[in-house]
Each structure stands twice: as C-alpha cells, then as structure tokens.
C-alpha cells in the first residue's frame, strides 16, 4: 500500500493510542452483528444469538484482540503487506475457506470503530489514510485466493 510520509505519520500517531484489546473485540463483534452471515466461521464461539451476546462474548473479544495484533504487525510492514499476511492468507483461504470479501468488511468496521473511539481526532485526513491501510490489508489477506 502506498502512503505518503504524512499519512504514515497520521496512522502511526493514532494507532499508538489504540487499545488493541478493546478495539479488536469491538470491531470483530460489530462485524458479526452487522454482517450476521460472518458468524458461520465462529460457531465454536458459543453464544452469538443477539447483539448483546456477541459483544459480551469473551471468545469474540479474544479473537478480536488476536486479529488486531496481526493488523498491528501489518502496520509495521506497510511496504510488504502481502509477505506479512501470506501465512494468514493461506490459512483463511485453504483451511478456513473465509470469503475474502469479509476482510474488506472487517476493515471498514474497524474504521467505524476508530471513528467512534477517537471522535474529532479521527479527521477525514486520518480516515483516508486508514482506508488505504485497511484496503491494503484486505488485498494482502485475499492474495492466496487469486
């Protein structure tokens, strides 16, 4: 993904304030609530029967933290996202058979969660930079599908 120096700085500055545990759980939880068909990949997580059940589910929170940890790794390697996410792409494609569109959906949900958490600090300029990043990560995760 190509970011200008200013965009990289904006992403790094905001990301340094992100609570990965909370934001990860909220982002994955919202994905499962807003796009309920994505729940089929998480049937082993137990109670997903209502928005409250999803958002309070400790397995959703734990996996969201794991997902955002991988996203953080990607932020450290913006010039090599395909390489950074190669193993995860293979896992999600070959073993888990996740629809690659879900990566784009999760990226957009993450942007919504960041906007909710950071309010005025999440300016249109910062959002534009994050949209590039989440699109790049989604493309990298979908790489093995092509």
Curated annotation (Swiss-Prot):
Family affiliation: Belongs to the globin family.
Protein residues bound to heme b: 63, 92
GO cellular component, one term: blood microparticle
Domain Globin: 2-146
One of the GO biological process terms: hydrogen peroxide catabolic process
Protein name, UniProt field: Hemoglobin subunit delta
UniProt keyword terms in alphabetical order: Heme, Iron, Metal-binding, Oxygen transport, Phosphoprotein, Transport
Pfam families for this protein: Globin
Tissues in which the UniProt entry reports expression: Red blood cells.
Presence of keyword Manganese: no
SUPFAM superfamilies referenced in this protein's UniProt entry, alphabetically: Globin-like
InterPro entries in UniProt: Globin, Globin-like_sf, Globin/Proto, Hemoglobin_b, Hemoglobin_oxygen_transport
Coiled coil: none
GO molecular function per UniProt: haptoglobin binding; heme binding; hemoglobin alpha binding; metal ion binding; organic acid binding; oxygen binding; oxygen carrier activity; peroxidase activity
Phosphoserine carried by residues: 50
Gene3D superfamilies xrefs: Globins
Subunit structure: Heterotetramer of two delta chains and two alpha chains.
């Amino acid at each position: 993904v190509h970011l200008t120096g200013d965009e990289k700085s904006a992403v790094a500055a905001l990301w340094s304030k992100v609570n990965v545990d909370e934001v990860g759980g909220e982002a994955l939880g919202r994905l499962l609530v807003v796009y309920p068909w994505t729940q089929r990949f998480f049937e082993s997580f137990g109670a997903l029967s209502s928005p409250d059940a999803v958002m309070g589910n400790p397995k959703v929170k734990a996996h969201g933290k794991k997902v955002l940890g991988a996203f953080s790794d990607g932020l450290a390697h913006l010039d090599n996202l395909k390489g950074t996410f190669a193993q995860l792409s293979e896992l999600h494609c070959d073993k888990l058979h996740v629809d690659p569109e879900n990566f784009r959906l999760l990226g957009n949900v993450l942007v919504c969660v960041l906007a909710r958490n950071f309010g005025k600090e999440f300016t249109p300029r910062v959002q534009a930079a994050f949209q590039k990043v989440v699109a790049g990560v989604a493309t990298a995760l979908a790489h093995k599908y092509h």
